[in-house]
Every structure is written in structure tokens, then in C-alpha cells.
Amino acid sequence: HYKNNMYTTVIDGEDYAIKPMNCPGGMLVYASEPHSYRDLPLRVGELGLVHRHELSGALHGLFRVRCFTQDDAHIFMTREQMESEIQNVVRLFDEVYNVFGLKYTVELSTMPEDHIGTVEEWEANQEILKKAITGMGKDFVVNEGDGAFYGPKLDFHIEDCLGRTWQCGTIQLDSQLPERFNLEYTGEDGQKHRPVMIHRVVFGSIERFIGVITEHFAGAFPLWLTPVQVKVLPVTDRAHEYAKGLTQKLVDAGIRAEDDCRSEKLGYKIREAQMQKIPYMLVVGDRDMENGTVSVRTRKGEDLGAMTMDAFLSKCLSEIASKSKDI
């Protein structure tokens, strides 16, 4: 099913391939030791690097690449646990996407022509996905024939600030690969049973999600997310040591801060920091050194005036802890 998109080679007469998906590894982790019904649900997560030979014309920045990182998890469970586990994953999606202020729509992707397993199994699993998502009061649309080859799935399409949608999260219900890998658990009756499995990703491709949120925020990330949160800008050479001390205090408090002690005009340094979307700029001069204060500016050009370093630290740490989107 993935052969045409895989990178393969032959070494000493043996065929080798770079993995295009993480799923077989999840199967092998489960199969590495015996399991009882008491172990289930068993949730196995990883950040796995995968390679897929996409056509060159389909490649698009961070959005479509040939090597990317998936935040994969494989959840092994009994049939009785399927609905609650699906809903647990949806709650995880809500928690993560809400942090970024992202809305989503849901698609139920059904059995493709090129599938494994019986029609009856597919229909039963599709009904479980429907029941789980509607039981949470969420709407969905049906995407006929777009399921994975091993099972139906719920696809979560997040919407960016331009109204574009990107498929990121997915919940794939799979009773086929546990069969192919001969996975088992010992039931309450002492007999061997076959588990069922969920494949889930929240971000999908980490690289693509970074691209999505970069465009969504137009580079002006919330304070908690931005790579450099504070830039300290001394007005004169006399304030360099004071600026460096402030920067170190910020770093010691866990804030990502830098100072700009170049011999450039203050206006130039402020404009450059604004272009870099730095949330806060601390302008420090002779008066600030005398009073032990900092003059605070935002990337939007707002002048918040002078405040003590402790007051500014408290403000920053509060915004970071709350994951505030306002800056």
C-alpha cells in the first residue's frame, strides 16, 4: 500500500526500506510481552520520523515534505473500550487546539476500494466512530471512500486565520493490523482475544503544524510560544551592563530573552525587534538605571511606560502560565 512512496535500497542482497509510517513499530512494542485485559487500554506514544517519496510538484514549504515527524500514538483496547477511548482522544484534541485558538471541522472517512478486512467489520467500526463523535455533541460530514486501507477514521481539519483548512488530527480505528500481527491479550475468561487499536495523531506532521500556526499568527506568536519573548535595548553604552544584567535575570526566571547592545540607533533596534515580532522590548537608559526600572514597549508599538523589573517579570510569567493569546 505504501510501496510506491517508499525509499528502498539493497544491501548485501537484502532489501531495506526507510519507514513511511510508525504503525508497525507500535505493533512490535505491544507484541514484545504478553498482556492481560487488566493492561488495557494500553497507550503507546512516540514522536516518529517518517519518509515518503512525494512527487516534486506536490512539495510545498513545511506543508508537504518528504521527511517529517509524526506525534503518533497507538492505543490497544477491548471492543467495549472503543467508544470511550475515541472520546478521550477527541478531548485531547480540544485541549490542544484550544490553546492555539484553533477551530476545527470533523470528517468521517469511510471504506476505500483498496482495503483489507470484511465489509461487515468496516461498517461496525464506522458506526462506533459515528456514535462516539455524536455522543459528544459534535457534527461531522462523511468523506466517502477516503479511509485508511486498514480502517475508517475521523479527520480533524483545523482552520487558520485566512479561512483555509488543514487536516491535522486523525483517529483511525483498526481491527486489521492487530490481526495481521497476531496480537493477543488474555481475557477475564482466561482465553486469548484479539485487541482492537486506534491510531491517533494530534498535530499530524509537526512540521506542517508549525507552518500552519506560523501563518495563522502571521509570525506574531503568543508570548508563551514565541522563540524570543523579550528583547532588552540599552539607549547608551553606559546602560550595556545594566541591560545584560536584566537579560540574565529574565533568563534565570525561565523567559527567553536577548539583549541588543550593538552600536545602532535606538529607533533602528526597536523597528528591527518589531519586525522580528518580539512581544516585549525593554528600553533602558540612565534614568532606568537610577530608578531600577525598565521602559516597556510592545511589538504593536504600545508604550506601557516604566515599571520595576519584578513587576514586569510577574506580568510576563502570568501571561505565559495562562497561555494568553493577547499581545
Language-model region placement:
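NTP/phosphate- and nucleic-acid-binding module
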Residues: 1-327
